[in-house]
Curated annotation (Swiss-Prot):
Protein name as it appears in the record: Chromosome partition protein MukB
Organism domain of life: Bacteria
Source lineage: Bacteria, Pseudomonadati, Pseudomonadota, Gammaproteobacteria, Pasteurellales
The record's note on its domains: The hinge domain, which separates the large intramolecular coiled coil regions, allows the homodimerization, forming a V-shaped homodimer.
Gene3D superfamilies found in the cross-reference section: 1.20.58.850, 3.40.1140.10, Immunoglobulin FC, subunit C, MukB, hinge domain
Gene that encodes the chain: mukB
Keywords tagged on the record: ATP-binding, Cell cycle, Cell division, Chromosome partition, Coiled coil, Cytoplasm, DNA condensation, DNA-binding, Nucleotide-binding
First-listed, main subcellular location of the protein, grouped into a coarse class: cytoplasm
Coiled coil: 322-693, 861-1140, 1233-1289
């Protein structure tokens, strides 16, 4: 609440509420209501009432708040505003239409709560309640929201949960959201419910209410029970509908009946659908057949007409094209002749130019011949001068070498003479010893100094001069050896270098300037070709003669080829070789003979061809008659191949496949029968396990009913699935036993039994309280050991399929049903396969009987096509005969002209056949060119190559180290001169050594030396004179040789210059001047002159032919115009029909019906026959579609022959209409044609299958009667058990209360009729037009004609008759005083007796609900039991004590309201006193315990 309210004074309960423990049949304790909390109610701001485990009494005066407290409890229990209506027992004239139901006035403004604190069998604390709040307005509405709280500690006070303390005297009521936050903070679970159904489902699952309240009717029953308890008495609302309260609805049996009836209904509907489908099949066949005939005949008639128009158009087009071809050929010939005339004119001009060129060429050849003679003379001169020039050059070189040697010798002699003269002069000055001694001494000293200077020896002296002299002498000797070696190497290199240079110069002279490194390779090339060139040069004259001869033959061949070309052009042939010419000549010779013979043969051949054409026409007609039947056979064969998925090449394949189908059918039939047997076994097993008590033997049920007992399996029908194997093994073979109350009473009946199992077990016991503790058993891992007696043990294993426990049977039933469904599906598939095989075999049998003889014969249409082709060829041949004669005459004229040309060509055939002549001419010409080039080369360089040949090998190694060797030699000479000068200086000192000591002896020696020098000087002077004379002689010789060489060189250059000029002039002329050139040029000129005259004659002939062709072109143009006009007229017809035909083709192909319409067998019918067929089909279709507006309109539109596409649209409409009528639950295809085929296969199978299914699904009237009796018996036993708890109840004069269950007489008659064998009633259950519910309703009406059924249908009445509750009358009776057992009615009982009796009835209802709900609630949950009683003052103290004893015995809580003068001795009593303090009002509560006992 938003405002704060004063907190009421809460008095503590003076005595604690006792906790009484009750023993229950179940092991779990029963749930209890712990307290009731009211927040912000009228008079109660925050009050919690702790509830006693037995009786809680609210004591107080009028208006103390007792009814308000009970209203809060009921509101928390059933928060449904459509049901809540609080009034007291004194309220009169209260109606349900009152706006205020009593709840709005009991609340205060703001948030209000009504909550119940409970603890269930699981020791879980659960607080459930409702948040209430007044809604402003005149309607006095109340807003209710339900919630639950779980997980709170038991010590938590409910009052503190819903309020928030502000101070010591004030508190605030929490809103629902604040309450949720507070609970979540405390760690508990808060849940709000948006529907009363969810709220009650939670209360049921947790054991707060005894019954699951699924709907508003269930809530209404619960509220009426509470209301009846609250106000007391025997409630007529409950007693009138006591069956609904006490007897549970047998949903399983009812649903089983409904499922079976639904299956039967569906089965019968399917059978009706099959019958409709069979009618549809006939309709399909009729519509498809007539529509196909109607549309396909018109389709093929238009196709035939279109084909005929196209053939006519093609024929006209061929005539047109043939005329155009002739025109084209004529124009082509005109063009060719025009081109030929132009070419001839052009050739004529060209030949004139060529003829003039030939004349000019002859002049050039003559001029070239004159130049060639000069060239030959100059070439001879040049060759001669070249040879002399080479010889003279060698002479000059030899003279040059000799001159150089002489000059060297003269220079050496001059040097020696000068040295001797110098020595003589030196010695001449020292002749006088006295005069020269000092001079000699000084000279010796000077020589010594000079030696020191030259030798670079500072320590040189007289003593060591000899040693130094020896050293320098040895050095000079080694240098001399080195110089000699270098001189030797120089001489060798000088010779090699001279030969290499000479050879290199020769190579450069021939090949031009080339690198020294490639000189040898070039020399090898030149020398390799040199012998061949010499041979070629020698053959030049022979080659010229050969070339002249070949050119003459070639000119003759060209003349023959031109003649052959002219012949080919005129004869319009392309003969290239002699063989062809000879063959053509023979052909032309035979042509004249053959023409006459061929003309005579044509008559005979024409008659033969005409006879053959007639035979082919007869054969064509035979095949045309056979073609429709063959096409029909092929269509049937294709259908069989499509159906079977096989390809048949011949009739043997068909027969083999039929045999294989028979084998396959037998195998499938065996599989189908096996599956049917397996299915029957499964259904039998399912039927046995589906019995309500699980009995597999129906005789046991009869015996149990006869003995008044119950099957043991029925007693254990509710055991859990995990305990079922244990109990089944516990009883072993006795699990099929019958539990009876008295064995002695049954023993007398055993001898009279006729139908009885081999072993019948009877167990004495109370079926209502049967206990298995009499058996001594021990449970093992896989079974149970039972001590039967002291000397007998029985061990029973746990069965896989336990008899006990509905849950175990249902689980196994699910597996069996799934297995049965799988087997049923497989059986249906095998049955379908069998039907398919049978149908396929039937189709094959029909095919063998009707079409096998034709199906595998050759295609008549292919044969007809071949015949037509042969006929066309014959027609062409006959047409050719017409033109052959004219062609032969033309050939004869041509042949004569050709023979004249051939006579000219025949002698020259060998020449024409010589194809290699031109090659040989070219080859010879090339050889001559090469020979002439070689001849010129040999003339120019023959002598040079002769000189090069012996010394060419010197070019292999280039003496390129010669210069370095020369440098080394000069260096060695220089070193030798230096060493010799030093040695000479040392020798001079050594010679002057004696001057230092022996002056006289030296003088004597000098004199001798002087004489020797003079003698040597004279000898050298003589030698010098001789050398000078020789040198002068060699110089004169060299001058003469050199002059001759220069003269030869000048002459060679002049000759070569003139030769080059002549060669250049000949080259500029561009002709070859050989011996036959002049003759060839003259022959060429004469030939061109002849060709020119022939060309002029041909041109005149061609111009005449052109004039003739132009005159024939006019008649050909008129023929072309006529043919074109006929073709275009026919083509317009084809094009006009093509538009609608394209629409027809597009529709047929787009809708996939072209194959249905293109009936090839109709192509052989005439237009009248097809039109007649279409008209007949149209009449049949008008009748067939008279009831279908859409098809009737489509058919009417299709009758317009100007639009054939409408017929295709009608076919598509029929096709679509039939496709929509296909039963997809039976036929798995969209194609009506295939649907017809599948119908044939499927309908018979489905009919048999559904007939068998209906027989199995059919509900037996006897079985229904047995089920009803069994269910009634079970409920009678249950009511009997409930009566046991009411036997000792006494209220006033009422000593006992009981429930009486009786079967209505009308319904008993019905059960007897159902289980009887009266034939008069069997017509109702064998009528397949009625369901079982309708049949049982009809039977009820027959048995009870006096009962008015009202407006209810038979189906509704039958469904009510399948509910066992409608068979029973349930009444409450009391045993009262001397009256005995009386029907419990309020008028016959006092108020207290009525209240006690009504409370007893309510306890029976609650207990019945608990038993009914035990199967769907947790096994460890025992629900709370609590009833109300307002105004308990209507009962006396003894009745109240009896009520308290009943509560204690049934472990039930009771909440009563009593005035202040009522003080129960047991339970908890709350004293309620309403107090008013100022403007505030509250109820003062004091709790007491049993104060009456202490008074």
């Amino acid at each position: 609440m938003s405002e704060e309210l004063a907190l009421e004074n809460l008095e503590h309960v003076e005595t604690s509420v006792p906790h009484t423990v009750f023993s229950h049949a179940n092991s779990a304790p029963r749930g209890k209501f712990r307290s009731l909390t009211l927040i912000n109610w009228n008079g109660f701001f925050a009050r919690t009432f702790d509830l006693d485990e037995l009786v809680t009494t609210l004591s107080g005066g009028n208006g103390a708040g007792k009814s308000t407290t009970m209203a809060g409890f009921v509101t928390a229990l059933i928060p449904d505003l459509t049901l809540l209506h609080f009034r007291n027992t004194t309220e009169a004239g209260a109606t349900s239409g009152s706006r205020d139901k009593g709840l709005h006035g009991k609340l205060r403004p703001g948030v209000c709560y009504a909550a119940l604190d409970t603890i269930n069998s699981r020791n879980q604390r659960v607080i459930v309640g409702a948040r209430l709040q007044q809604v402003a307005g005149r309607d006095k509405k109340v807003d209710i929201k339900t919630f639950s709280i779980q997980g709170l500690n038991l010590a938590e006070n409910p009052t503190t949960i819903f309020t928030d303390v502000v101070n010591e005297r004030q508190a605030r009521v929490l809103t629902l959201n604040e309450l949720k936050e507070k609970i979540e903070q405390a760690g508990a679970q808060f849940k709000q419910y948006h529907s009363i159904t969810d709220y009650h489902a939670m209360m049921f699952d947790l054991g707060i209410i005894p019954k699951r309240l699924r709907s508003s009717s269930d809530r209404s029953k619960f509220y009426k029970l509470i209301e009846a308890s609250l106000y007391g008495g025997i409630s007529s609302a409950i007693t009138r509908s006591l069956r609904d309260y006490l007897l549970p609805e047998n949903l399983g049996v009812r649903k089983a009946f409904q499922d079976m009836e639904s299956a039967l209904r569906e089965n019968r509907m399917t059978l009706e659908a099959i019958k409709v489908t069979q009618a549809d099949r006939d309709l399909f066949k009729h519509l498809i057949t007539e529509t196909s005939n109607y549309v396909a005949s018109d389709y093929m008639r238009h196709a035939n007409e279109r084909r005929g128009n196209i053939e006519s158009a093609v024929r006209f087009r061929q005539d047109w094209y043939r005329a155009r071809t002739e025109q084209h050929l004529s124009q082509q010939r005109l063009v060719e002749l025009s081109r030929e005339a132009a070419e001839l004119a052009e050739n004529e001009k060209t030949l004139e130019v060529d003829h003039q060129s030939a004349v000019d060429y002859l002049n050039l050849v003559l001029n070239a011949l004159r130049h060639q003679e000069k060239i030959a003379r100059y070439q001879d001169d040049v060759a001669e001068i070249t040879a002399r020039l080479e010889e003279q050059k060698m002479v000059v070189e030899t003279a040059t070498e000799q001159l150089e040697e002489s000059q060297v010798q003269v220079e050496q002699v001059e040097q020696e003479v000068d040295q001797i003269r110098a020595q003589l002069a030196d010695y001449q000055q020292a002749l006088d010893a006295q005069q020269t001694r000092a001079l000699q001494y000084q000279q010796a000293i000077a020589a010594l100094e000079k030696a020191k200077t030259l030798c670079g020896l500072a320590d040189l002296g007289v003593k060591n001069v000899e040693a130094y002299h020896d050293e320098f002498a040895a050095h000079a000797e080694s240098l001399t050896e080195q110089v000699l070696e270098l001189e030797q190497r120089m001489s060798i290199s000088d010779a090699a270098k001279s030969q290499f240079d000479k050879a290199y110069q020769l190579v450069c002279k021939v090949a031009g300037e080339i690198p020294r490194s490639t000189a040898f390779e070039q020399a090898k090339v030149l020398l390799r070709d040199y012998p061949t060139q010499k041979v070629q040069a020698q053959q030049t004259s022979q080659l010229r003669a050969k070339l002249h001869e070949l050119e003459q033959r070639y000119a003759q061949q060209q003349s023959a080829v031109r003649l052959l070309k002219e012949f080919n052009q005129r004869a319009n042939v392309s003969l290239e070789d002699a063989e062809a010419l000879e063959a053509y000549h023979a052909e032309q010779e035979a042509l004249l003979e053959d023409v006459s013979a061929e003309l005579s043969e044509q008559v005979e051949q024409r008659s033969t061809l005409r006879q053959k054409r007639e035979q082919l026409s007869a054969l064509y007609q035979d095949n045309a008659k056979k073609a429709p039947a063959w096409l029909t056979a092929q269509a049937a064969l294709e259908r069989l191949q499509d159906q079977s998925g096989e390809t048949f090449a011949d009739s043997q394949d068909v027969m083999q496949f039929m045999q294989a189908q028979l084998v396959k059918e037998r195998e499938l039939t065996i599989e189908r029968d096996q599956l049917e047997q397996q299915r029957q076994q499964l259904e039998a097993q399912i039927s046995r396990l589906s019995q309500p008590d699980g009995s597999e033997d129906a005789r046991l049920n009869v015996l149990a009913e006869r003995f008044g007992g119950v099957l043991l399996s029925e007693l254990y029908d509710d055991v859990p699935i995990e305990d079922a194997p244990y109990f089944s093994a516990l009883y072993g073979p006795a699990r099929h036993a019958i539990v009876v109350r008295d064995l002695d009473a049954v023993k007398g009946q055993l001898a009279q039994l006729e139908e009885c199992p081999d072993d019948l077990y009877l167990i004495e016991g109370d079926p209502t309280a049967f206990d298995d503790s009499v058996l001594s058993a021990q449970e093992l891992a896989h079974g149970v050991v039972v001590q039967v007696s002291d000397r007998e043990l029985r061990y029973s294993k746990f069965p896989e399929i336990p008899l006990f426990g509905r849950a175990a049977r249902e689980q196994y039933l699910e597996a069996l049903q799934q297995q049965r469904d799988d087997v049923t599906e497989q059986h249906a598939q095998r049955a379908f396969d069998v039907q398919k095989c049978q149908r396929l075999h039937e189709h094959f049998s029909q095919f063998v009987g009707l079409h096998l003889a034709l199906a595998f014969q050759p295609n008549p249409e292919d044969v007809m096509a071949e015949i037509q082709q042969q006929r066309n060829e014959i027609e062409r041949e006959l047409n050719q005969f017409v033109t052959t004669e004219q062609q032969l005459r033309i050939q004869l004229d041509y042949a004569k002209e050709k023979m004249q040309l051939l006579n000219k060509l025949i002698p020259q055939l060998n020449l024409i056949a010589d194809e290699s002549l031109i090659d040989r001419v070219e080859e010879c010409r090339e050889q001559l060119d090469i020979a002439e080039q070689d001849e010129l080369f040999i003339r120019q360089y023959g002598a040079t190559l002769s000189q090069l040949e012996p010394i060419a090998n010197t070019l292999q190694s280039d003496p390129e180290h010669y210069e370095r060797l020369k440098a080394d030699y000069e260096q060695a000479i220089s070193q030798q001169k230096q060493v010799q000068q030093r040695l000479f200086a040392l020798a001079d000192v050594l010679q002057r050594k004696a001057h230092f000591a022996y002056e006289e002896r030296v003088q004597t020696e000098n004199t001798d030396l002087n004489e020797q020098l003079r003698a040597k000087l004279d000898s050298l002077q003589q030698q010098r004179e001789v050398q000078k004379a020789q040198l002068q002689q060699k110089q004169q010789q060299f001058t003469n040789y050199n002059r001759v060489y220069i003269e030869l060189q000048t002459s060679f250059n002049n000759k070569m210059q003139m030769l080059q000029e002549l060669l250049q002039e000949v080259g500029e002329l561009g002709v070859r001047a050989d011996q036959g050139a002049e003759e060839r040029a003259k022959q060429r000129r004469d030939e061109l002159h002849q060709v020119l005259s022939d060309t002029r004659q041909r041109r005149h002939y061609v111009e005449k032919q052109l004039t003739l062709i132009e005159s024939e072109a006019q008649s050909l143009n008129a023929r072309i115009r006529k043919a074109e006009r006929d073709y275009k007229t026919q083509r317009e017809l084809v094009v006009a029909a093509k538009v609608s035909w394209c629409v027809v083709m597009r529709l047929s192909r787009g809708s996939d019906v072209e194959k249905r319409l293109n009936r090839r067998e109709f192509a052989y019918l005439s237009a009248d026959e097809l039109r007649s067929m279409s008209d007949k089909a149209l009449g049949a279709l008008r009748t067939a579609v008279a009831d279908n507006e859409y098809l009737r309109d489509s058919l009417r539109l299709s009758e317009d022959n100007r639009k054939p596409e409408n017929k295709v649209r009608f076919f598509i409409a029929v096709y679509q209409h039939l496709r929509e009528r296909i039963r997809q639950d039976i036929i798995k295809t969209d194609d009506p044609i295939d649907a017809i085929e599948q119908m044939e296969i499927e309908l018979s199978r489905l009919t048999d299958e559904l007939t068998r299914r209906e027989q199995k699904l059919a509900i037996s009237s006897e079985s229904v009667a047995n089920i009803m009796r069994k269910t009634i018996q079970r409920e009678q036993n249950r009511i009997r058990m409930l009566n046991q708890g009411l036997q000792n109840i006494a209220f006033g004069q009422v000593k006992s209360v009981r429930l009486v269950v009786n079967i209505r007489d009308t319904h008993a008659m019905l059960l007897d009729a159902l289980s009887g064998t009266q034939e008069e009633y069997q017509d109702l259950f064998t009528d397949q037009r009625m369901t079982f519910s309708e049949a049982i309703a009809k039977l009820y009406q027959r048995l009870n004609p006096h009962i008015d059924m009202g407006q209810r249908t038979a189906q509704t009445i039958g469904e009510e008759l399948l509910d066992y509750r409608n068979y029973l009358d349930l009444e409450v009776e009391v045993y009262r005083g001397a009256d005995g057992w009386l029907r419990a009615e309020s008028g016959a009982l006092s108020t207290g007796e009525a209240i006690g009796t009504g409370m007893s009835i309510l306890l029976m209802v609650v207990q019945s609900w608990e038993e009914e709900s035990r199967r769907i609630r947790g096994k460890d949950i025992v629900p709370c039991r609590l009833l109300f009683l307002d105004e308990a003052a209507r009962l006396d103290a003894k009745s109240i004590s009896t009520l308290f004893e009943l509560c204690e015995r049934l472990d039930m809580q009771l909440l009563i309201a009593a005035p202040e003068n009522i003080s129960p001795e047991k339970g908890t009593t709350y004293k309620l006193v309403r107090k008013i303090a100022g403007n505030q009002e509250h109820v003062h509560v004091v709790g007491l315990r049993g104060f009456g006992a202490t008074a």
